[in-house]
């Protein structure tokens, strides 16, 4: 399927009521600045805003309620990804080096973000510009990803740090928010 000059939806894509696909802001050189692959779902309240860049979402992905995805520097999401509610992915950043000049007047940088296939991003996570997330990675809820993550890594925290690898046994105890410990035996 093809919608307008800036948006392309593949077969079986589900765009739920209340989701926003903003293609009007795309004034950049990209002929198509929003592409969503076969079988992917965009849930109510999710917003996809390419701006002057592009957003490319692979096959069988789910973008959950209230997620906010920008495309200024380019955003590529591989097949079979799960992006949980209220996640923010922003491939741009403000320049703030000069304390004399207001931040709004210093411009922006935009490198782009690449997310591999079969990645799960937990609720309220933030993914910042310039990051590459490897295939099969898992990002914990509320984490802020500021640097690249290797394939199959499990990352949590602010800033996110790798605490394990999918498919390997974790024998350590991980403190939970109440101060007690949770025993981890197998993460798959």
Where are these regions (language model features)?
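Double-stranded beta-helix
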Residues: 164, 170-171
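C-terminal/domain-terminus segments
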Residues: 132-156, 160, 173
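Non-catalytic C-terminal accessory region of glycerolipid acyltransferases
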Residues: 154-156, 163, 178-180
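Flexible, glycine/small-residue-enriched loop-and-beta-strand segment within the central core
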Residues: 4, 14-127, 158, 166-167
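Membrane-proximal basic amphipathic "stem/tether" segments
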Residues: 1-5, 174-188
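Mobile, glycine-enriched helix-loop/loop "lid" segments at the mouths of ligand-binding/catalytic clefts
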Residues: 90, 97-99, 171-181
């Amino acid at each position: 399927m093809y919608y307008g000059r800036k948006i392309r939806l593949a077969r079986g894509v589900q765009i739920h009521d209340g989701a926003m696909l903003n293609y009007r802001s795309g004034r950049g050189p990209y002929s198509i600045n929003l592409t969503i692959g076969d079988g992917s779902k965009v849930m109510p309240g999710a917003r996809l805003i390419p701006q002057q860049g592009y957003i490319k979402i692979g096959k069988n992905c789910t973008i959950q309620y209230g997620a906010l995805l920008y495309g200024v520097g380019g955003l590529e999401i591989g097949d079979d990804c799960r992006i949980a509610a209220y996640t923010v992915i922003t491939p741009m950043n403000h320049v703030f080096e000069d304390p004399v000049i207001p931040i709004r007047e210093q411009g922006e940088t935009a490198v782009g973000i690449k997310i591999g296939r079969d990645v799960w991003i937990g609720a309220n996570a933030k993914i910042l510009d310039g990051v590459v997330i490897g295939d099969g990675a898992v990002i914990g809820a509320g984490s802020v990803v500021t640097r690249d993550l290797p394939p199959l890594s499990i990352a949590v925290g602010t800033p996110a740090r790798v605490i394990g690898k999918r498919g390997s046994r974790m024998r350590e105890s991980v403190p939970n928010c109440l101060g007690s410990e949770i025993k981890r035996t197998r993460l798959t």
